[in-house]
Amino acid sequence: MPQLRSRTVTHGRNMAGARALMRASGVASADIGKPIIAVANSFTEFVPGHTHLAPVGRIVSEAIQAAGAVPREFNTIAVDDGIAMGHGGMLYSLPSRDLIADSVEYMVEAHCADALICISNCDKITPGMLMAAMRLNIPTVFVSGGPMEAGKATLVDGTVRKLDLVNAISDAVDESISDEDILRIEENACPTCGSCSGMFTANSMNCLTEVLGLSLPGNGSVLATHTARKALYEDAGRTVVEITKRYYEQDDETVLPRSIGTRAAFDNAMALDIAMGGSTNTILHLLAAAEEAELAYDLDDINEVSRRVPCLSKVAPNVAPGGTYYMEDVHRAGGIPALLGELHRGGLLNEDVHSVHSDTLAEWLKNWDVRGGSPSPEAIELWHAAPGCVRSATAFSQSERWDTLDLDAAGGCIRDVEHAYSKDGGLAVLKGNLAVDGCVVKTAGVDESIWTFEGPAVVCESQDEAVDKILRKEIEPGDVVVIRYEGPRGGPGMQEMLYPTSFLKGRGLGKVCALVTDGRFSGGTSGLSIGHASPEAASGGTIALVEDGDRIRIDIPNRSIELLVDDAELATRREALNGVYAPKNRDRKVSAALRAYAAMATSADRGAVRDVSKLG
């Protein structure tokens, strides 16, 4: 029977000083000896996805206390990728993921916590906490801040338009849109607290924690503003105490993150990710989490899943034939359990999985899938939680309900396998001489007319150079924009390329150009945007050898990407570089913190994790 980790500080005469400090921080004498649950919050006023989380920590802590354990709350950092986008701040986004993982580890290990509950939400916070959970392998539950409501703007001509953050970025460079309309779009694109309203990185990852079995049903889709989310926080607090007692009092190791997050669970997570056309960043983060779990899982495994799973849902920034769906629409369609149910009925899930709330997948779907299960009235009520359509930065500020659910499996937000948007899933891994170790593309956001594409390269040594060329109208239809030295080492920090892709879209080039990079893309990216080229340029990848005018061929159906230059010429170019792989004429200030990250960073095919063996 495992002993409570906290016994190290709660028992024995020699630890009187530690207990004195615990009493000073508010722990009552009667509570010393109970399980200590670390409550990892991520409240910050910088990020709309986190600005409402201050009271959430208290709600979760009160539920933990009532269930018989001792909550101890602390905060991690949280970077807003949207605010950091388009300038040097984006260099810090991906490295913050690993810093968050470390900070959670430091707090849990330093204070001998017995279990962990992670209150996350936005782009790097959920992945960082997921890495920490897999690293620590103590009982853990995730509960996120929830999605933002979709925006709605009335334009000057009276047109009412539903929108999100990406519209505010791409429309800003569309010269046909007036300044007044741009202001209205800006003012209404992000109307509430919560993670941005589409299937961008934050919401993708929060949905995937459901499939990995580490969060409760509804975690990825209940809106941040809805009162139903408060009940979710309370349930999460109770659940983490339940699984903590199962582990320490019943020796039940099945509740540990590595027992839940098995290869089968990762396969199911990728199946859902591919079916819903999630952010390409999810691939990066799942690979990193698998590495922390000491689980052999790589791009080849992901590619195998992508070959058999169709695209069943298209949520912004992906556009469905009938219009654009948002996270509130996913929720109305039954949330992640409904999408899992469709995959299960299609024979596309591994059934040998469990979660923090259900012992089997069958139990999970029976209780929560509104399409094929037999959910309770309370579960059905959860899926009726609707947007309030009122600007608010406050959690639990509204309790609107949908009159009906979207159960249309043929033409609704979530389709069945028979009516899939495409037989190919929403994400794909490409390989070829330009990316020997692989690269990724969000096929759900690519017009099928350009799934095969060939064009001349326009080489950019940085994201900034690419933006300048796009805005100066130097990019022509048919071009392949190549942005290199933006990988984990080369950036350093592997910047997101939302501005270049959004500006291509705003210039009307989104369906007639391609973009290839060793950097990465925002979950809000659409178009033929291929990222994570590995090895990256700074590690001597072929992308470092590309020259202006070289032809590049992209073939999504056959999962290939080729630089149409013969091997002898590439060898000559490599010899000319003389082992120096660095950008030309790039003026960029790189801090000591970023240099430290770059010294250990691996390429994207390994999740851009740090390899401490590089330290010697």
Curated annotation (Swiss-Prot):
Residue sites binding [2Fe-2S] cluster per the record: C122, C196
Its keywords, alphabetically, are: 2Fe-2S, Amino-acid biosynthesis, Branched-chain amino acid biosynthesis, Iron, Iron-sulfur, Lyase, Magnesium, Metal-binding
**Molecular-function GO terms, alphabetical:** 2 iron, 2 sulfur cluster binding; dihydroxy-acid dehydratase activity; magnesium ion binding
GO biological process annotation, one example: L-valine biosynthetic process
Q: Give the co-factor note.
A: Binds 1 [2Fe-2S] cluster per subunit. This cluster acts as a Lewis acid cofactor.
Report the pathway entry: Amino-acid biosynthesis; L-isoleucine biosynthesis; L-isoleucine from 2-oxobutanoate: step 3/4; Amino-acid biosynthesis; L-valine biosynthesis; L-valine from pyruvate: step 3/4
Q: Report the EC code(s) recorded for this entry.
A: 4.2.1.9
Cofactor list = [2Fe-2S] cluster; Mg(2+)
What is annotated as the active site? S522 (proton acceptor)
Gene Ontology cellular-component annotations: cytosol
Instruction: Please list the residues that bind Mg(2+).
Output: D81, D123, K124, E496
Top EC class, one word = lyase
Reaction catalyzed: (2R)-2,3-dihydroxy-3-methylbutanoate = 3-methyl-2-oxobutanoate + H2O; (2R,3R)-2,3-dihydroxy-3-methylpentanoate = (S)-3-methyl-2-oxopentanoate + H2O
Q: What does this protein do?
A: Functions in the biosynthesis of branched-chain amino acids. Catalyzes the dehydration of (2R,3R)-2,3-dihydroxy-3-methylpentanoate (2,3-dihydroxy-3-methylvalerate) into 2-oxo-3-methylpentanoate (2-oxo-3-methylvalerate) and of (2R)-2,3-dihydroxy-3-methylbutanoate (2,3-dihydroxyisovalerate) into 2-oxo-3-methylbutanoate (2-oxoisovalerate), the penultimate precursor to L-isoleucine and L-valine, respectively.
Member of which family? Belongs to the IlvD/Edd family.
Q: What is this protein called?
A: Dihydroxy-acid dehydratase
User: Which gene holds the coding sequence for this protein?
Assistant: ilvD
